[in-house]
Design a protein with these regions (language model features):
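Feature marks short, highly hydrophobic, charge-poor N-terminal signal-anchor/signal peptide-like helices
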Residues: 1-10
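Cytosolic-side junction of a single-pass transmembrane alpha-helix
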Residues: 15-29
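Acetyl-CoA-dependent GNAT
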Residues: 27-84, 89, 144-145
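Conserved hydrophobic beta-strand within the GNAT/NAT acetyltransferase core sheet
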Residues: 83-86, 117-121
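Conserved acetyl-CoA-binding loop-helix of GNAT-fold acetyltransferases
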Residues: 88, 94-107, 136
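Conserved active-site alpha-helix within GNAT-family acetyltransferase domains
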Residues: 111, 123-144
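Active-site/acyl-donor-binding loops of N-acyltransferases
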Residues: 140, 144-155
Length: 155
């Protein structure tokens, strides 16, 4: 009986996961995708930020844009905005959650007047497949030291 209940719980969990992914990220629901993210804008000291969270709480990303009034308002002299803290629940990777969050972060940067965005990848903190994924997302990668790459993209 216990084995049956454990199997049933596992099946129900998988069904729930597939249902969530299907509802939120399947192309059948494109008209709802704009409403499936919460964007919180904040003014910080010397920069504006946007926090983007998908409403199913499967992932999030942040964007920082230095104030245009600063003398040096470009990030590492390369970009108008920094995208950071892109995170997707490991159980939902491969379903397009990260791509949608990254695209929305780029869109938010564009709405804030940015023409280029950048992010950093560090091999000590992040698997190499993430660097390859950013390159597939049309980011140009340049090594900055033994461990770090700067990735940039024109919007």
């Amino acid at each position: 009986m216990i084995h049956f209940l454990a199997t049933l719980c596992g099946v129900l969990f998988v069904y729930a996961v597939v249902s969530i992914v299907d509802y939120f990220f399947n192309n059948k629901h494109k008209e709802n995708q704009e409403d499936m993210m919460t964007i919180i804008h904040q003014q910080w000291y010397k920069e504006r930020r946007a926090l983007i969270v998908d409403n199913a709480h499967l992932g999030m990303v942040q964007v920082a844009v230095p104030d245009p009034d600063l003398d040096d308002n470009r990030i590492q002299g390369k970009a108008d905005a920094l995208i950071y803290s892109l995170w997707v629940d490991e159980h939902f990777r491969g379903y397009g959650v990260g791509r949608k969050l990254l695209k929305r972060a780029e869109w938010e940067a564009k709405l804030m007047g940015c023409k280029t965005v950048c992010l950093e990848w560090d091999c000590r903190e992040t698997p190499e497949w993430v660097l390859r994924w950013y390159k597939c997302m049309e980011y140009d990668a340049k090594r900055t030291d033994d461990f770090t790459w700067l990735l940039t993209k024109d919007l």
